[in-house]
Amino acid sequence: MTHGVDTSFVLAVEIVEHAHHVEALRLLGELLARGDRVAIAPQVLAEFVHVVTDVRRFQRPFSMEIALNKSERWWNAAEADQVLPKDVAITLFHSWMRRYQLGRKRVLDTLLAATYRAADVTSLLTLNATDFTVFDELSCIPPLEIS
C-alpha cells in the first residue's frame, strides 16, 4: 500500500524534539518494513522547508542547507513515489472546495488531498487527521493510533 505524507508527519519524523517523533518514526519504519511505500507531493516539501527554518518556531531551526538536504532525501527516497498535482488533481481540488464549502484556510490541505487522491493514494500519514476527515476518499493514519 502507498501512503501519502502530510507535512505534519514529515516534521514529526525529522525533528527529534517533536512530541510525536518516536511514534512517527516507529510507524514509518513499520510500514516500510512490511513493503509499503510513501507518496510525497512537492507542496509538502516546500512547507517542510518553510517550517523547519523558521526562527520563530524553533530555538534551533535547521539551516536552509540541512532543510534542503532532508527535503531531497524524502523526494529521492527509493521507497517514495513522487506525486505531482496534475490536471485531474486541480479539477478535484475545485470540486471538493465547492462540494464541502471549504474556506481559504482549507485550500492547501484540499489541494494536497486532491493531489494524492488523483494519484490513487487513499491513505494519509498525518498528525492533523481532522483537517482531512471531510474527504471520504482518504483514510488518515495518525501515528498514535497504530500499534
Where do the PLM segments sit?
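Hydrophobic helix-cap positions at the C-terminus of alpha-helices
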Residues: 30-31, 74, 96, 100
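Alpha-helix/helix-capping structural signal
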Residues: 8-9, 43, 111, 130
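Active-site neighborhoods of divalent-metal-dependent phosphate/nucleic-acid chemistry enzymes
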Residues: 61, 80-127
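Acidic, PIN/NYN-like endoribonuclease modules and their adjacent C-terminal/linker elements
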Residues: 2, 110-147
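Short, well-structured N-terminal submotif of metal-dependent ribonuclease cores
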Residues: 1-40, 55-69, 147
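Short beta-strand segments at enzyme active-site cores
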Residues: 39-42, 126
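Short, conserved active-site loop motifs that form the nucleotide-linked donor/cofactor pocket
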Residues: 36, 80-81, 138
